[in-house]
């Protein structure tokens, strides 16, 4: 998408279904899932008009500089730096954070203001970022967030956080993706997202990994900023107490919001520096002996699943934006936007980690999936397999955590691939999907729960945050009964729909036996992974134990009670 004109429909690909705004028409959940599951997205069509159907968004007091949507992220060094970020409904005067160790002296850190104007609605969003530096490792700090025009200045927002330990030390982190908001007036939101945030607090991690598709604002084009607001305010009960480290997903890509559609995401989050011109899109940080690498998979995937106009009406931005209507069939496809810069950065980061004796583990976070056998969701993407899996093999990545498909799936450790093992989904002809190959003998015992990841990488699909569209139905090869995956091996360009003037995006073009799939949760799509890292002793083993908790029955009725589904231990020789 260029800076000025309508997105080029010839290079756009995304699929979506939504009734034109203001018509009073609705799309059933069943129909929505059919389209969202088939193409990995949902759609946006119609004009952005005052009075369009929407969720309740009421402001009972005049907008001022009162802090809200408060969240923490790690700085470049989690042992000594935390960033406090927030938003306000109007510009804040002298926005600041007061911080100090428990019962100690308080320092004032002034925040930097960042704004963006939503490209569809013209709403100006004010955000603030205070970088707290010079902190001590493994230390608890209390802080207050306020401004001169904070209506709660007499009793400002306050919370606390704990910095990461220095050197090898045990710690806990949690992860899931695809969270949404509790406001059921928004497309794909569900009350389960409230319970998902509570689940993080139940397990008290040092930090949380949020694996993309944060709130699905691009599925609510007339109210994108309101959706973001509901999302961030919902998270405050956890994200103000511990860093929430995100990666962008396809639903963070929004029309007219920057070259990759990520202006909202990038304005709201301050993330570790990657030293490139694409700040905030990918990054890394180290806690204890674990290197965490966060990637933007939209740069390499074949599937187009970002902002999309299904038609038959164009998407018409608010007049104040000065932006042209977006034609039916347009989608925001960004594959290759970094021209290989992200992949080169990834290789350099992995190479340095391989030479660093203080790093035992490498965990990669991204949104889309290299290994997924979801039938009603998106499936796997050959683009990731081509660009990044060889690097994961070469440099010994231990674990990959993703979202995208709204379910839980765990792979065996994989290393290398089988060539020409897939088939065309329509013709049955052979297709090279680069089928990931399980490490020999790891799948001989399907009940095994301990794996040496020095021999291969385990992939986890953790897409059951809080979205209203669980996708816990998995593919089966009807010929042999084995798990089966659908795979995108080429772009899924929009094609004409069955209704005149509408467009859809095709599902994945290839199929393969999912010989790499070790565990799938057919009971519910919702859950949270809890990881406990034990650095071990010199000369011995180090372990990372994953307990996956799911919410039985939440597909039908939101459920706050998460129960243990499985426990898996990753182990390897400590450096």
Where are these regions (language model features)?
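Active-site glycine-centered loops adjacent to acidic/histidine catalytic or metal-binding residues
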Residues: 178, 212-213, 249-250, 367, ...
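N-terminal twin-arginine translocation
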Residues: 25-34, 41-60
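Metal-dependent phosphoesterase/phosphodiesterase active-site architecture
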Residues: 18, 56-96, 104-106, 113-115, ...
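Ligand-binding face of N-terminal immunoglobulin V-set domains in extracellular IgSF glycoproteins
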Residues: 126-134
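The substrate-binding groove and active-site-proximal loops of carbohydrate-active enzymes
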Residues: 179-188, 214-225, 250-251, 298, ...
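Mature extracellular/periplasmic domains of secretome proteins
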Residues: 196-204, 232-237, 348-352, 387-391
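N-terminal active-site segment of His-dependent metallophosphoesterases
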Residues: 65-69, 76-81, 88-93, 101-106, ...
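N-terminal secretory signal peptides
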Residues: 1-27, 45, 54
């Amino acid at each position: 998408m260029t800076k000025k004109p309508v997105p080029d429909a010839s290079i756009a690909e995304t699929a979506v279904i939504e009734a034109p705004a203001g018509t009073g028409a609705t799309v059933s959940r069943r129909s929505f899932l059919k389209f969202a599951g088939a193409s990995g997205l949902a759609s946006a069509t119609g004009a952005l008009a005052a009075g369009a159907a929407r969720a309740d968004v009421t402001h009972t007091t005049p907008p001022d500089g009162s802090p809200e949507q408060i969240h923490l992220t790690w700085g470049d060094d989690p042992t000594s730096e935390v960033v406090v970020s927030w938003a306000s409904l109007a510009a804040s005067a002298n926005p600041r954070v007061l911080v100090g160790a428990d019962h100690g002296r308080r320092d004032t850190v002034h925040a930097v203001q960042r704004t963006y104007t939503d490209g569809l609605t013209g709403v100006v969003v004010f955000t603030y970022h205070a970088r707290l530096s010079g902190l001590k490792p493994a230390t608890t700090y209390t802080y207050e967030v306020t401004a001169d025009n904070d209506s709660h200045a007499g009793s400002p927002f306050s919370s606390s956080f704990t910095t990461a330990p220095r050197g090898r030390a045990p710690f806990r982190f949690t992860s899931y993706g695809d969270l949404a908001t509790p406001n059921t007036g928004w497309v794909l939101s569900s009350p389960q997202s409230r319970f998902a945030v509570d689940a993080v607090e139940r397990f008290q991690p040092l930090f949380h990994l949020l694996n993309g598709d944060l709130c699905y604002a691009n599925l609510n084009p007339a109210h994108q900023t309101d959706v973001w607001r509901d999302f961030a305010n919902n998270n405050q009960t956890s994200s103000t107490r511990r860093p929430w480290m995100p990666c962008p997903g396809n639903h963070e890509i929004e029309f007219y919001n920057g070259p990759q559609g990520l202006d909202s995401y990038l304005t709201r989050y301050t993330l570790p520096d990657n030293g490139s011109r694409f700040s905030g899109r990918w990054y890394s940080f180290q806690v204890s002996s674990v290197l965490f690498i966060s990637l933007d998979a939209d740069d390499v995937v074949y599937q187009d699943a970002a902002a999309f106009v299904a038609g038959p009406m164009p998407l018409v931005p608010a007049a104040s934006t000065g932006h042209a209507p977006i034609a039916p069939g347009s989608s925001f496809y960004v594959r290759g936007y970094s021209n290989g810069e992200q992949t080169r950065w990834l290789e350099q980061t992995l190479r340095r980690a391989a030479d660093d004796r203080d790093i035992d583990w490498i965990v990669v976070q991204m949104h889309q999936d290299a290994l997924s056998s979801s039938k009603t969701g998106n499936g796997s993407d050959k683009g990731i397999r081509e660009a990044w899996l060889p690097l994961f093999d070469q440099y010994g990545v231990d674990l990959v955590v993703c979202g995208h498909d709204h379910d839980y799936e765990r792979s065996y450790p994989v290393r290398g691939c089988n060539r020409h093992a897939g088939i065309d989904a329509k013709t049955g002809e052979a297709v090279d999907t680069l089928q990931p190959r399980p490490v020999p003998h790891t799948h001989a015992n399907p009940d095994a729960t301990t794996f040496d990841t020095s021999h291969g990488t385990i992939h986890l699909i953790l897409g059951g945050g809080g979205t209203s569209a669980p996708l816990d139905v998995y593919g089966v090869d009807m010929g042999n009964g084995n798990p089966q995956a659908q795979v995108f091996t080429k772009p899924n360009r929009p094609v004409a729909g069955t209704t005149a003037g509408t467009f859809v995006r095709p599902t994945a073009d290839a199929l393969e036996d999912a010989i790499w799939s070790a565990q799938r949760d057919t009971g519910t799509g919702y859950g949270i992974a809890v990881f406990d890292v034990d650095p071990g002793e010199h000369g011995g083993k180090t372990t990372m134990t994953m307990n996956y908790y799911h919410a039985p029955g939440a597909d039908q009725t939101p459920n706050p009670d998460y129960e243990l589904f499985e426990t898996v231990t990753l182990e390897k020789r400590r450096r």
